[in-house]
A protein has these predicted regions:
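ATP-binding pocket architecture of kinase catalytic cores
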Residues: 2-6, 23, 27-158, 165-171, ...
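Active-site acidic catalytic loop and adjacent metal/ATP-binding pocket
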Residues: 37-44, 50, 87, 180-229
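Generic recognition of well-ordered alpha-helical segments
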Residues: 15, 71, 75, 129, ...
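Helical cap/lid subdomains and adjacent loops of hydrolase enzymes that gate the active-site channel
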Residues: 146-185, 247, 253-257, 282
Length: 300
């Protein structure tokens, strides 16, 4: 648990939801364990989920951010070929819980793991259709906002140096430094396209081996078109990655940049969550291993 983590339990969540959303008074509420690190999630009846932010933040700024995310979720839901949650309510903080929270529609399915669909060309093809639909969304004059992943790779040098330092004894840091040196020197990405921005296993739902839904759509926004390619190394083995790359028609540069974003994300997971969240640390390790073993990117 982080030092700034805010406790939230079922009785507190139940009281807040029933007080602020009286029409849900009769709905059962239960906590949903997950590997997520940003929100505590509670199931509200059969059709909704409540997401309570876990870390200290300015309530007014967070409310504005959640409102922006709600708009992005609505836009994504209108473009996605698979179900994605929409926000149906914004809860207010009170003395029992100091931050705003959200009510969202519930999407059924099994949360993916790094290996669940690794050998599935059908799942890879589903991801292709999802990303193509996002890329076809009109930017309406928007561009990358400069925050987080999705812009210039060298902007992340300081963070990567921190990760390399903290990963000593956990990973083959000299080899990984060399790998980043190649990634950061890649040509700039193509024109921005609309991107989910965080296609990790925890945000992808599976049913019958197919993509059944995509979660956490609040970051739907313009970015480097290679950003959503991170799913290739977070989830897919080599044959399925080939299906994915060919389906998207990715150029070699776009593919390498996708690998770079997956690498940047994975390097922050292993050391940071080594003790607090083994599943997230494991995702980081498996992604790094896939990148190192990938003949198209690991031998840069």
């Amino acid at each position: 648990m982080r030092h700034d983590q805010i406790p939230i339990d079922v009785p507190t969540a139940q009281a807040l939801i029933r007080q602020q959303f009286p029409h849900l008074r009769s709905e059962p509420i239960r906590f949903l364990p997950s590997t997520g690190t940003v929100n505590a999630i509670f199931r509200v009846g059969d059709l909704l989920a409540a997401r309570f932010p876990l870390h200290e933040s300015d309530p007014a700024e967070l409310a504005e951010s959640l409102s922006t995310e709600a708009d992005a979720m609505g836009e994504l839901a209108g473009r996605s070929p698979v179900p994605t949650p929409t926000c149906v309510g914004l809860g207010r903080p009170d003395k029992s819980y100091p931050l705003p929270f959200t009510l969202q529609t519930w999407i059924p399915g099994h949360v993916a793991t790094p290996t669940m669909v690794s050998d599935s060309p059908k799942f890879a093809a589903d991801l292709v259709r999802f990303i193509q639909a996002l890329r076809a969304t009109d930017l309406d004059g928007r561009s990358f906002n400069g925050r987080g992943r999705g812009g210039a790779l060298p902007d992340h040098d300081e963070w990567m140096e921190h990760c390399f330092t903290r990963s000593a004894g956990l990973l083959d840091v000299p080899r990984l430094r060399w790998m980043w040196a190649g990634f950061r020197g890649l040509p700039a990405g193509g024109n921005d396209t609309m991107s989910h921005g965080d296609l990790t296993p925890a945000n992808l739902l599976v049913d019958g081996g197919r993509l059944a839904g995509v979660l956490d759509g609040g970051g739907f926004a313009p970015a480097d078109p290679s950003l959503d390619l991170v799913a290739a190394w977070h989830l897919l083995g080599r044959p399925a990655r080939t299906t994915f790359k060919e389906g998207l028609g990715s150029s070699d540069v776009e593919w390498q940049r996708g690998a770079a974003w997956a690498f940047q994300q994975a390097m922050g997971l292993v050391w940071y969550y080594q003790r607090s969240n083994p599943a997230m640390a494991g995702l980081g390790r498996s992604t790094v291993e896939r990148l190192l073993d990938d003949p198209e990117v690991g031998a840069r």
